[in-house]
Every structure is written in C-alpha cells, then in structure tokens.
Amino acid sequence: MSFEQTIKMPEDRIGVIIGKNGHVKEDIEQKCNVEIDIDSESGDVQVSSQASRLDKMEPFKAIEIISAISKGFSPERAYRLLKEDLLDLLDIRDYAGKSSNSIQRIKGRIIGKAGNTRKTIEDLTGASISVYGHTVGFIGSFEEIRIAREAIKMISKGSSHKNVYNMLQAARRRAKFEKMQLWEHEGPQPSNRTDF
C-alpha cells in the first residue's frame, strides 16, 4: 500500500518548489522520505510515499510544506513545519468582499511600508506570515498563530496599527508573565537526599 496526493500549485510558485537545480524538491524529498513529481504545465505536484512512512507523518509534512510554499512562504520558512509548528490560512475576502481594490488596500495595510507591519507582527508573535493572493498564511505554534491571526483580523477590519501593536505588546507581556508564574510554581525541586 502506498500514499499518493496531488496538490495544485500556482504557476508562479512552481519554480520555487523546484528550486535552483532542483535543490528544494530534492530537499523536501530527503527530509520527508517522499517522491515528488511536478507537472510544470498543469501546476500539479504529486507527493507519493510507501505505506511504512505513513506512521511517521512524513508525507503529510511534505504536503504541508508544499502547501505553505504555494501560499507564498519561502522554503526555509516552510521547513518550520517539520517541527511541531502549524500552518493556518486566513482569506482576506472575508473582510474585503470580492472587490480587488479592497483586497489590495487590506494587503497593503497588512504588509505596511517596506514590509514593516508584517515584520513587526512576526517579531511580536514569533509566527511567520506570508501575504499572497487573497490569503494570509501563518506558520508557528498554536499560540503564536492565534495572536498573529487576531492582529491580522484587526487590521483587516480597519483598526489602527497603533491599537494592533498595543494588543500584541499586551499579549506578549501576558505570555511572559504566565511563563514566569509557571516557573515559580514549579520552582526548584526538593532534594530526596538524606546523606547530609
């Protein structure tokens, strides 16, 4: 028994999944123990693996990595998915409707001047963010994605960048405080030694 799944890639992302001299494709194949066949004309990317690999989730990780690359992430950022990180997508059309002008305006607000808004959200949450087409992609832990997604929703609904940054900084302080409390509650463990 074997595993096989086909993913449709946008035409302008085919070159990224192949990589220079085929290195990205080979890298994904090696890291995930899969075979990848790419049809450059149709945009179909077929991932296949032997059944023995399914218990390690490797083929599914390959599909997640390819999906992330198709949504605008660089291969290096997509490789975060090999760890415990997750991929999540948000459709800008939920906030802009189908108007291409509204979609472009919201994308511009999310990216910011010279990419500063996106970079600030990434820095304050730890999530990687990609804006491609009408979607915003997130890679990170559940909590990183939750906070970054909330920031993007606020921007998409028209909140000022200042309010979004304030929310992000408050969330960051709260997370640090919770981490400190966890450390205090665990604290150093008493020694069981009796030979003092």
Describe the predicted segments one by one:
Residues 1-196:
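RNA-contacting regions in translation and RNA-metabolism proteins
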